[in-house]
């Protein structure tokens, strides 16, 4: 990797002062270090945040809402009984990330701000990879793990953050802090589509870092389900999270978010509308089809997989027998 200056920050103020243009913030480093070793990302300075105590911890409860600071380790989420009981979509998704070793190093902020695992990007061809003759490497090449929504543009990679999915389904907010102070946005608004290979994947301003995630008071039921190649140390192919509120036995409101199908975290409006005003059964859940999907040449399997994953997510959320779906 390229030689770089190392700054071990011990406070938020020190970190913000050190994060000059050309710098990169690092907590667990499970994504950044891999990109640096492969020369995909080559910062002049790395600002280490692991010793910034102001950025780690979980507070609050399901009645008032829970705040998770960005430097909190994934293992700490799994140790939280409040999250396990009331925000099971987040707890379940976190439990599936990597291995115990990775979960003990990886941070919430790092997971949310990681970069795509598209092999063309990781091989140095950029987020919007084009060959010398102008062909799109992902559209015309091996796209088995790419998006099936928003495929008319050049950003065809699948969004990489699994934790973003339950957080969006749960209606979580993200607080960013930088030289101009703090601002709070929806978790979904952390992300944007790059317009060039040098453009950012994130809406964070220069010098800003993610400070915390805020979950609203827990209402209704929530859950997650994912499909993957193998059961351990693998990324999901498709994963979904749902948050449902009820009026009696019928769904009065629904939020369904999906991983692995678009360059942004995907809100499945079709799935949400399909179950509103109805009781969740295997039949009503299956009606939440992959409406609007436009798969590429090698990933049409994700359309069928998405239907099953959403069905099983909704069944898990309400406690139905998902294995019959």
Describe the residue ranges of each PLM region:
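C-terminal structural segment of proteins
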Residues: 1-325
């Amino acid at each position: 990797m390229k030689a770089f200056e190392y700054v071990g920050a011990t406070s938020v103020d020190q970190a913000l002062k050190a994060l000059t243009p050309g710098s990169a913030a690092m907590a667990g480093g499970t994504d950044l270090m891999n990109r640096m070793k492969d020369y995909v990302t080559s910062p002049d300075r790395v600002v280490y945040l692991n010793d910034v105590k102001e950025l780690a911890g979980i507070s609050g409860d399901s009645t008032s809402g829970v705040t998770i600071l960005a430097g909190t380790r994934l293992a700490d989420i799994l140790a939280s009984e409040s999250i396990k009981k009331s925000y099971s979509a987040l707890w379940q998704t976190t439990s599936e990330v990597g291995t115990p070793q990775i979960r003990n190093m990886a941070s919430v902020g790092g997971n949310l701000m990681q970069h795509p695992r598209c092999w063309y990007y990781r091989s140095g061809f950029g987020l919007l990879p084009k060959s010398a003759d102008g062909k799109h490497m992902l559209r015309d090449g091996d796209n088995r793990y790419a998006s099936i929504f928003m495929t008319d543009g050049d950003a065809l990679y699948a969004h990489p953050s699994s934790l973003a999915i339950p957080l969006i389904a749960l209606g979580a907010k993200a607080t960013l802090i930088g030289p101009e102070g703090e601002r709070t946005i929806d978790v979904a608004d952390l992300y944007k589509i790059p317009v060039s290979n040098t453009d950012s994947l994130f809406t964070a301003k220069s010098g800003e870092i993610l400070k915390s995630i805020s979950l609203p008071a827990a209402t209704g039921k929530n859950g997650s389900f994912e499909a993957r190649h193998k059961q351990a140390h693998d990324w999901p192919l498709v994963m979904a999270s749902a948050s449902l509120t009820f009026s009696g036995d019928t769904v009065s409101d629904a939020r369904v978010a999906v991983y692995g199908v678009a360059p942004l975290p995907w809100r499945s409006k079709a799935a949400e509308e399909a179950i509103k005003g109805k009781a969740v059964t295997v039949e009503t859940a299956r009606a939440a089809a992959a409406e609007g999907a436009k798969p590429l040449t090698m990933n049409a399997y994700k359309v069928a997989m998405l239907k099953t994953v959403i069905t099983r997510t909704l069944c898990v959320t309400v406690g139905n027998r998902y294995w019959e779906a």
